[in-house]
């Protein structure tokens, strides 16, 4: 496999520092990517430690399979399958779960993967190109209403309805023009609709993000894996999540806050707060890339890392 598309791991040392509390623990990397975090975790583990990583991308799996370490195992699946996969391996509790969300640089930079609006390629956008429906296939059948909702809700795009209508209008010309199946043409359609320019952002950014999230069911999978991680963490275990846009971070923030807060007590009921079960999580804060990291890797600028520890048995 070539190395033409390089990936810089964001918040590498900070994430591993927050995650690894026991060198003999069992850890999970929910998004192997190109292995930056996984290799750093393995470097911190002792002989009895163990790391189980997940990824949907076949190229990530190829990279992971080059790691010759008896303490490491890669699972070709979404992190949403984490609970079942660990149950199947006899793993009931883990010392830490790391989730580095979003798309990796090799996925974005390779036009053949269909994530990029900067270089023309097939309109795919699947993290795992061997499974599920591609972006082109979904765009070929989605209604104006469904397109509008996805682009509005997952892209926070105020021109969602106009973009949806333009996509459907282009689809009506398929007999003459052929199918809408290239990233370049989709970006062009969006560019004709979105006349305003956000500083440093291509007009197609929000629409491509929205379609990618929908095709890969990213937010639904995130909800599933957060619940799984909470159930898997041992007392003292850490959950570390790196998000790259507000939709992801909002879900993570609300989940962590909900499980780090004591339930409200109705003063009219004969129940003392001290009699209620303690919340399972303690929030350990959040971190952002420093100026030097952002200068070296501009894609890190939107990253936020949230850390929580399981305090209940």
From Swiss-Prot:
GO biological process: rRNA base methylation
EC number: 2.1.1.199
InterPro entries assigned: RsmH, SAM-dep_MeTrfase_MraW_recog, SAM-dependent_MTases_sf
Catalytic activity line of the entry: cytidine(1402) in 16S rRNA + S-adenosyl-L-methionine = N(4)-methylcytidine(1402) in 16S rRNA + S-adenosyl-L-homocysteine + H(+)
Purpose of the protein: Specifically methylates the N4 position of cytidine in position 1402 (C1402) of 16S rRNA.
Protein name: Ribosomal RNA small subunit methyltransferase H
Binding site for S-adenosyl-L-methionine: 35-37, 55, 79, 100, 107
Record-stated family: Belongs to the methyltransferase superfamily. RsmH family.
Keyword S-adenosyl-L-methionine among record annotations: yes
GO molecular function: rRNA (cytosine-N4-)-methyltransferase activity
Top-rank taxon: Bacteria
Localization annotation: Cytoplasm
GO cellular component: cytoplasm
Keyword tags: Cytoplasm, Methyltransferase, rRNA processing, S-adenosyl-L-methionine, Transferase
